[in-house]
Structure formats: C-alpha cells, structure tokens
Amino acid sequence: TAANADSKPYATIAGIKAVQSHLDRLGLNAKVEQARRPFTYKVTYAVPDSHPLVSIIIPTKDHADILNNCITSIVEKSTYDNYELVIIENNSTEKVTFDYYDKLQAKYPDIVRLVTWEHEFNFSKLMNFGVAHAKGDYLLLLNNDTEVITPNWIETMLGICAREDVGAVGAKLYYPDNTIQHAGLCVTGGVAGHLCQSMPRNNWGYFALNDAQQDFSAVTAACIM
C-alpha cells in the first residue's frame, strides 16, 4: 500500500509502457503520457504525413463580434497551419456584419472563403452547403460562438480522425462559467443526452471519464471532425 500515487512512480511508468506497447503492436503511430489523474493515460495520435488540409466550416448570422472571437481564436491560437475557413452567411441583416466579412476576407485572403446560403435556416442543409464549397481532406464543423482554448486542438482531433476505425471526433466544450457543456452524448431509449453537462470543468467524473478519450454514442456538431 502507499499513502499517495506519487509514492509508486514505477507503477505509472509501467502503465505508460503497457499502453505504448499495445499501440505499437497495433501499428498505431501514437505517444502515451500520464494524464491529469494518477494511473490514467493520454494518447496523442500522429497527424498523417501528408499534412492534410482541414476545412473548418462555420455557419453564422449577424453577431459579428461573436464570429470575430471565434475566428481570432482559431488564427491566433491554433498550432496546425494547414486549414481553411469556410464561413456560411445565413440571412444576416446588420451592416456591421457585412463590413466584418469584407475585412475578414481582406485580412486572410488565403484561408477565408465566404459562401452565402439564401434560404431559410436548416442546419443540415446549411452545413451540407458549406461542405460542398470545402476543399479540405477533412471537415471540421464548428459553431460560431465557440472559442479555441487549446492550441493543438486541430492536430489532436485530426490524429484520432485519421484512424481507419474512427468515424467522427468531438471535443470537450465548456460554458463561460467553466462548467462542462459537452463531454460526449449518450443515446438511451432513442433520445440523445449530454453526459456530465454543467459539472465543474476540472471534475474528473466517474473513473476519470470526464478526462479521457473514449467512444460515445454521438458527439455534438458544435465541434466535430
């Protein structure tokens, strides 16, 4: 027995080696590290050697300040550099919004493309319209009211998404008050519901599930690759 986890660092090292060996045997290019909670492990999958283009597709209507926060956080914080921003304009009416579009395209002509959806709001049709204008190898759907807080978010999602056995990858999202907005969806009885919603951001949850990569029934389209 031990008073705390730090008393047996060799156990943590052994755990890392065990998980790393498993991934190596599977032929997966990934690195294993200790996660925040003792005896839990973080796996970072390598980005494909082709350094693929990621199309970030963002639907928006007015509220230029909100969109600006989103775009600025992507451009200033993201460490992955091969991406494009497909902005879907959906029936905005405010002049400040269209002025912002002009400034945005002038400032980032190589990565920003504005497309206009002239029909009534329908999320599925709206996003499919944006996808039709995307040039990337991978698609990342993103709400305009989100803000990047983790610099390596694109490559982290991309590394997982590039695996042949993965269909889609979501992200852990927080409300402004640092509580959990999204940490995966569970479908029970034909109804989808958020897991651990409104729990404190740093709450690990049952068996540290709030802090671990795992399979879910679904993930929110607010941020999905």
Which role does the model predict for each range below?
Residues 8, 20-76:
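N-proximal low-complexity "stem/linker" segments adjacent to membrane-targeting elements
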Residues 139:
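Short aromatic/hydrophobic "clamp" motif used to bind/position activated sugar donors
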Residues 147-190:
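Conserved donor NDP-sugar-binding/catalytic core segment of glycosyltransferases
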Residues 1-17, 180-190:
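Nucleotide-sugar-dependent glycosyltransferase catalytic core
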Residues 124-125, 132, 188-225:
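A recurrent flexible, glycine/aromatic-enriched loop bordering the glycosyltransferase active site
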Residues 75-116:
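Acidic donor-binding segment of Leloir-type glycosyltransferases
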Residues 118-126, 131-134, 148-149:
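A short, glycine-/small-residue-rich helix N-cap motif at loop->alpha-helix starts
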Residues 90, 142-145:
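Active-site acidic Asp-centered loop
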